[in-house]
């Protein structure tokens, strides 16, 4: 299909709008990682106790992704996105007003509900809205929104929290979401539900061993990453003995490296997703094993964070491409399952980091995370050799 320059420009503008929405959603998902110490101090709790909020959020997303996707499968996507943002904004206002930790957790559950639906439909929408032959690049742009949430949203949210209080951070995210909602209303066309699948799709997907193997890989590698990443801010301050300001800089470096990873994947991901993901998991293993040794200096931690950020971004993108390639006939169901399983990994990793920090030593979170990372590497090599497939091999 030939797309004239104007149509191509409009198509990219719509994908950019989704990328902005991804930035907003990922900023609020990631920002508690940089605010754990401040929230703990506010409620007179231990940092590890507050960290359970990360697990609750992730597991709510995991449990609700598929049910919510099925309940909304026939709703026009533009209208659905608008409704999601209304709940998203209201939940952030409640976060701002939270008078105790329980209320804060309730507000985060509301945000998690919107998250569960948003990430089950966004990748497939980006592919629908992208110019012909640019599906991997469209996914890369969405991932850039994710990376910018890490490189800008998370550090800025942390700085705002340091100087104006963590409540202000959540309020600012809510106001940013309001502006984004206005942009969505003005720019997005009507998007009827397509290839969303139904409960009938589940047995079909479950009979695809390549897809099931990929879901298992996702859960294991994400668990590995979040075991250490969830507690990187207190690790930098309490284990490495470095300043709170350097913790902010480190998060900035890690997120910036994620942008590099998304650019690399956008260039090579169409045909080499399997190789890129395998290399990235290898990098993740090395980074986790070297986390404690690197804590002896700011320079070593900064260098490690560059490779870590590149690795996790390539892993996330590669997994999405593989899922979409293996389930082109039920993309929303497949992505809902992917989002749920991804968040099982986040919750499991955050819980592992929580338990290690409470009952053992926070200094070992890298070593603990490296165990599932090594298992993920072996599994990745096995399944990618057995089931090689690329996104562009599938019919549009």
UniProtKB/Swiss-Prot annotation:
SUPFAM superfamilies in the cross-refs: MFS general substrate transporter
Top-level lineage group: Bacteria
Subcellular location: Cell inner membrane
Keyword GTP-binding appears in the UniProt entry: no
Name of a matching Pfam family: MFS_1
Keywords: Cell inner membrane, Cell membrane, Membrane, Sugar transport, Transmembrane, Transmembrane helix, Transport
Annotated membrane topology: Multi-pass membrane protein
Record-annotated membrane-spanning stretches: 15-35, 50-70, 81-101, 103-123, 136-156, 169-189, 209-229, 246-266, 275-295, 301-321, 333-353, 364-384
GO cellular component annotations of the record: plasma membrane
Gene3D superfamilies given in the database record: MFS general substrate transporter like domains
Keyword RNA-binding listed: no
One Gene Ontology MF term: carbohydrate transmembrane transporter activity
Chief localisation class: membrane
Homology family: Belongs to the major facilitator superfamily. SotB (TC 2.A.1.2) family.
Function description: Involved in the efflux of sugars. The physiological role may be the reduction of the intracellular concentration of toxic sugars or sugar metabolites.
Protein name, entry field: Probable sugar efflux transporter
């Amino acid at each position: 299909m030939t797309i004239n320059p104007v149509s191509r420009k409009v198509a990219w503008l719509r994908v950019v709008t989704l990328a902005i929405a991804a930035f907003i959603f990922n900023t609020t998902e990631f920002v508690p990682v940089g605010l754990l110490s401040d929230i703990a101090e506010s409620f007179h709790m231990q940092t590890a106790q507050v960290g359970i909020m990360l697990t609750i959020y992730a597991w709510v997303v995991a449990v609700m992704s598929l049910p919510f996707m099925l309940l909304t499968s026939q709703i026009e996507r533009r209208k659905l996105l608008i409704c999601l943002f209304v709940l998203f904004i209201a939940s952030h206002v409640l976060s701002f007003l939270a008078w105790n930790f329980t209320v804060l957790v309730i507000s985060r559950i509301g945000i998690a509900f919107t998250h569960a639906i948003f990430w089950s439909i966004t990748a497939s929408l980006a592919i629908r809205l992208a110019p012909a032959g640019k599906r991997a690049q469209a996914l890369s742009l969405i991932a850039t929104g994710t990376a910018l949430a890490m490189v800008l949203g998370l550090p800025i949210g942390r700085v705002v929290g340091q100087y104006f209080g963590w409540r202000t951070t959540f309020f600012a995210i809510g106001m940013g979401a309001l502006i984004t909602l206005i942009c969505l209303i003005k720019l997005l066309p009507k998007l009827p539900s397509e290839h969303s699948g139904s409960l009938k799709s589940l047995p079909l997907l479950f009979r695809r061993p390549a897809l099931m193997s990929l879901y298992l890989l996702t859960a294991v590698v994400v668990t590995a990453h979040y075991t250490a990443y969830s507690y990187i801010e207190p690790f930098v301050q309490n284990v490495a003995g470095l300043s709170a300001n350097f913790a902010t800089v480190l998060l900035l470096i890690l997120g910036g490296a994620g942008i590099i990873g998304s650019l690399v994947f956008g260039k090579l991901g169409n045909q080499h997703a399997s190789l890129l993901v395998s290399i990235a998991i290898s990098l993740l293993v090395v980074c986790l094993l070297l986390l404690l040794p690197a804590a002896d200096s700011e320079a070593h931690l900064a260098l490690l964070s560059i490779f870590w950020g590149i690795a996790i971004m390539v892993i996330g993108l590669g997994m999405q491409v593989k899922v979409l390639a293996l389930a082109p006939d039920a993309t929303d169901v497949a992505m809902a399952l992917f989002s749920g399983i991804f968040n099982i990994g986040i919750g499991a990793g955050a819980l592992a980091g929580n338990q290690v920090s409470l009952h053992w030593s926070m200094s070992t979170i890298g070593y603990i995370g490296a165990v599932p990372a090594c298992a993920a590497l072996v599994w990745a090599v096995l399944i990618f050799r057995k089931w090689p497939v690329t996104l562009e091999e599938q019919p549009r």
